[in-house]
Amino acid sequence: MAANDRAAAPGKSGGSSGADGLMRASLSAVAPGTALRDGLERILRGNTGGLIVLGSDKTVEAMCTGGFVLDVEFTATRLRELCKLDGGIVLSSDLSKILRAGVQLVPDPMIPTEETGTRHRTADRVSKQVGFPVVSVSQSMRLVALYVDGMRRVLEDSAAILSRANQALATLERYKLRLDEVAGTLSALEIEDLVTVRDVSAVAQRLEMVRRIATEIAEYVVELGTDGRLLALQLDELIAGVEPERELVVRDYVPEPTAKRSRTVDQALYELDALTHAELLELATVAKALGYTGSPEALDSAVSPRGFRLLAKVPRLPGAIIDRLVEHFGGLQKLLAASVDDLQTVDGVGEARARSVREGLSRLAESSILERYV
């Protein structure tokens, strides 16, 4: 198999988060443009079925009876021809070799499964028992199903996936446009020191919505393989800087810890991620995830940023210097009022860097105000 035709080997699952990662790796291994996907499509076109285990270890070997050992290089045509035999096929863990063919796979019959067909029931049980992905090709239904540690995914053709992906991309473009609007408003309000919890929650809400739709599109990119290259480029362009912005907003506004309530940046990001779609639509719930009380009245409470987000927009300013500036001055308003001499009192900030920070903040302040009122 040519190196550029082979996707990364999926490996074995390791818990719920591991199963999700294994599913993504497995989808990548069977995506259009890979030799394995080519072989699966040849099986469908030949109107035959197949049962293929994507990996091997002692557990898989103990489950196999009959058939014969091959240990030959994987090719799409070999896979197609060997699937004409009764029985399953076992590939090496890196998908580079066909190890066995024509084998009968005998998983534990006590493993529960909701599948009905013999081939699909076997595939589901084998994947659960051994931890490797298993592909089942149905001759009668003409579909390919991927089983990964209790999860099932039917492989679709690129046209169907692209249709959904393009709809999601159009939604992402609208979300990103709205995000840019509320983020610009927040910047202007920060300069004027007029920010409320509602303003912060609106930006955090939009950032999370953009992140979620981008994650969905990224899944489509994985499934599309080589057919998703253009989609991947569009996605990268649209979400550039979104993830860092999300963390910067939280770092700017997560409340200072008190005796009754304390929340770290990581905790706030986790809480935002854990919100359901319905909860994300409520600004009060978003505010609560950030660490505020979440009452409707609290949304109009005034808050002040620490300055991480605006300082990150200053060119060529290292993160370590940003942290020192925020720690020294304590808030954005004091940073905006600081002179070049004041800035030089911070460790690591010389005259040239102090002038760069001073001029950068001044330009950001002017442009933010102009964008809001002009």
Swiss-Prot record:
Q: Mind telling me what this protein is named? A: DNA integrity scanning protein DisA
Q: Which Gene3D superfamilies match?
A: 5' to 3' exonuclease, C-terminal subdomain, DNA integrity scanning linker region, DNA integrity scanning protein, DisA, N-terminal domain
Catalytic reaction(s) noted: 2 ATP = 3',3'-c-di-AMP + 2 diphosphate
Keywords, in A-Z order: ATP-binding, DNA damage, DNA repair, DNA-binding, Magnesium, Nucleotide-binding, Nucleotidyltransferase, Transferase
Task: Please give the organism.
Answer: Streptomyces avermitilis (strain ATCC 31267 / DSM 46492 / JCM 5070 / NBRC 14893 / NCIMB 12804 / NRRL 8165 / MA-4680)
Which GO biological-process labels does this protein carry?
Answer: DNA repair
Q: Where is the DAC domain?
A: 20-158
User: Which GO molecular-function terms appear in the entry?
Assistant: adenylate cyclase activity; ATP binding; catalytic activity, acting on DNA; diadenylate cyclase activity; DNA binding; hydrolase activity
Residue sites binding ATP per the record: 87, 105, 118-122
Subunit note: Homooctamer.
Keyword DNA-binding among UniProt keywords:
yes
Q: Which SUPFAM superfamilies match?
A: RuvA domain 2-like, YojJ-like
What is the required cofactor set for this protein? Mg(2+)
Q: Briefly, what is this protein's role?
A: Participates in a DNA-damage check-point that is active prior to asymmetric division when DNA is damaged. DisA forms globular foci that rapidly scan along the chromosomes during sporulation, searching for lesions. When a lesion is present, DisA pauses at the lesion site. This triggers a cellular response that culminates in a temporary block in sporulation initiation. Also has diadenylate cyclase activity, catalyzing the condensation of 2 ATP molecules into cyclic di-AMP (c-di-AMP). c-di-AMP acts as a signaling molecule that couples DNA integrity with progression of sporulation. The rise in c-di-AMP level generated by DisA while scanning the chromosome, operates as a positive signal that advances sporulation; upon encountering a lesion, the DisA focus arrests at the damaged site and halts c-di-AMP synthesis.
Q: Which family does it belong to?
A: Belongs to the DisA family.
Does Aminoacyl-tRNA synthetase appear among the keywords? no
